[in-house]
Amino acid sequence: MAPSVHPSSSPLFTSKADEKYANVKWDELGFALVPTDYMYVAKCKQGESFSTGEIVPYGDISISPCAGILNYGQGLFEGLKAYRTEDGRITLFRPDQNAIRMQTGADRLCMTPPSPEQFVEAVKQTVLANNKWVPPPGKGALYIRPLLIGTGAVLGVASAPEYTFLIYTSPVGNYHKASSGLNLKVDHNHRRAHFGGTGGVKSCTNYSPVVKSLIEAKSSGFSDVLFLDAATGKNIEEVSTCNIFILKGNIVSTPPTSGTILPGITRKSICELARDIGYEVQERDLSVDELLEAEEVFCTGTAVVIKAVETVTFHDKRVKYRTGEEAFSTKLHLILTNIQMGVVEDKKGWMMEIDHLVGTDSFPDET
């Protein structure tokens, strides 16, 4: 049973052909789903190449109850953003890295991925179709969610016979509502990943297990949860949806991407930027003791970008860190976002511009 698409009959927000922007209160954007006009869909059989995808009206999809994603969690997702610059361009931040990461994840889960070229082209098409939903400069970004899911029917544990590559978008503001730093709780009871598992790829199955810890932490007033390694329970690894860094003196340290944490694209970029401005960067095991003795702590990720950590609580010990205008994380945030927003020259070659010369006449009607 091949998946089918059902366009939404009642979109929450609207976009008209003659509007530069969709009807959204940009100043009130948070990090919640705002459905846009279109999505991208492509399909392929196991071991074959993906078909040329289509831009279709955003809507529900129907798949077999025996689909691999539903029964065995055979699915991957990515997350990246499109930005609108002051001079009107729309750009993507390092989409080639997301394409490569999806390839790595697909190999781990025995899935057939789109080629890196098709991935990037599909992202461009999807953003172009939804260009009115890219927020004005400084008002947020268009979050892009590529999905690779096993939609073919399987009964026993096996690779799905068919896959769907789908991309949808949503305009977003800040991931965390509070303007101050994060208040993290170290979870000493649950583990996010273990060696030999799937912690190093963006598998759909990695995320629902952290929700219990996250709910418990937020009910106690914390912003998020920091998980420890499964082998010793003594080293820090990853926050629920982002990587973590510590600063002491001139040394910036972050846990290594050795298979149990996600190799974040923002993480990779921050390591490079920190070295550029004269800091030593160490990717190594970091103990809880080192965390508690750090001068600064911050998190990185597509959703959070760079976010300072104000406090960490481990058992009954609570440590406060440097935040604010003088913080190293604030400096890094400005450097990175200036590149992303086109405020400064992109000497890294990280930004990819979307061609505005292509119109939207070929996109299907939403009705």
Swiss-Prot record:
This protein's UniProt keywords: Aminotransferase, Pyridoxal phosphate, Transferase
Keyword Transferase: yes
Cofactor(s) needed by this chain: pyridoxal 5'-phosphate
Gene3D superfamilies linked to this entry: 3.30.470.10, D-amino Acid Aminotransferase, subunit A, domain 2
Molecular-function GO terms, alphabetical: branched-chain-amino-acid transaminase activity
BP GO annotations: branched-chain amino acid metabolic process
Modified residues (N6-(pyridoxal phosphate)lysine): K202
CDD domains: BCAT_beta_family
NCBIfam families hit by this protein: ilvE_II, PRK13357.1
Protein name per UniProt: Putative branched-chain-amino-acid aminotransferase 7
Organism: Arabidopsis thaliana (Mouse-ear cress)
